[in-house]
Design a protein with these regions (language model features):
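C-terminal motif of bacterial Sec signal peptides marking the signal peptidase cleavage site
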Residues: 6-9
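Short, well-ordered beta-to-alpha junction loops that form the rim of enzyme active sites
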Residues: 26, 81, 140, 174-175, ...
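A ligand-binding cleft/hinge motif common to bilobed small-molecule-binding domains
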Residues: 83-86, 243-253
Length: 253
């Protein structure tokens, strides 16, 4: 996931727009104390007052729709890398202003590996690293309650389709994660034989691949207790679900 500098041409008739910082982010990504203290820090750096407008989203596609169709003029947003690629392609981003006042420019310290991965989403004559700064990265996998599930059972994605887990599984309400889970499971043998890669599967949007993923998701449906983007952490800690296909950051919450 990456933070992105973003600014549209919309204005504000009642307040000077340059004195407002509009942020659109995932829940729990910025400590509330940081948001409260930032205007004072900004004034120390620049001598200018600043007000923050902070909004959160829980699904990448909803965030993109609000910006693209709602013409929301956020300054900073924090989508996943595949959404960055779409935003660049749609000309929704502006280059990052690297004038950080008295604070050093830390962007060159980004890991070369992460920078390389980020720039794989670049567009002709546009390097993604000029528009986005990596915020965090992680993996998706199976979080399980060991009161009900053994580590051995959780060691294979078969567990998501096992009928003994009927109504006990939470899945991420994310198109990319749901599609990826289904299509990877459907091609488990080919992956084991190294005749196809995960990247190839994730980028296969052919009618045949979509139909196969749909079939696998329908087979999984009886086991699903709900589709979540944020509440899975709490449900798992309260023993209301046995298994959560989730992001690594949520898993360590």
């Amino acid at each position: 996931l990456c933070c992105i500098a973003f600014l549209s041409s919309c204005g504000n008739s009642t307040e000077e727009r340059s004195r407002v910082l509009k942020i659109y982010n995932w829940a729990d990504y910025i400590d509330e104390d940081v948001l409260a203290e930032f205007p004072d820090w900004y004034k120390q750096q620049t001598g200018e007052d600043l007000r923050i407008i902070y909004q959160v989203f829980d699904i990448n596609e909803i965030m993109l729709t609000k910006i693209e169709r709602g013409h929301e003029d956020f300054d900073v947003v924090c989508p996943s890398e595949y959404i960055i690629e779409r935003m660049l392609r749609k000309d929704l981003l502006l280059p990052i202003d690297r004038n950080f006042g008295h604070t050093p420019d830390y962007i060159p310290n980004v890991s070369p590996y992460i920078r390389h991965e980020l720039n794989r989403t670049s567009q002709p004559e546009r390097q993604t690293e000029d528009y986005a700064v990596p915020y965090m990265w992680g993996t998706a996998g199976i979080l399980f309650n060991k009161k009900f599930i053994t580590a051995e059972e959780a060691g294979t994605w078969d567990i998501l389709w096992d009928s003994k887990n009927r109504g006990k599984i939470l899945m991420k309400d994310s198109y990319r994660d749901a599609y990826g889970t289904a299509i990877i499971y459907a091609h488990a043998r080919e992956l084991a034989d190294s005749t196809v890669t995960v990247e190839q599967l994730m980028n296969d949007n052919s009618p045949q691949a979509i139909a196969l993923a749909e079939q696998r998701l329908k087979e999984m449906k009886p086991n699903i207790a709900g589709w979540e983007a944020d509440f899975g952490k709490e449900m798992m800690t309260k023993n209301k679900a046995w298994i959560n296909f989730t992001w690594s950051g949520d898993a360590v919450w």
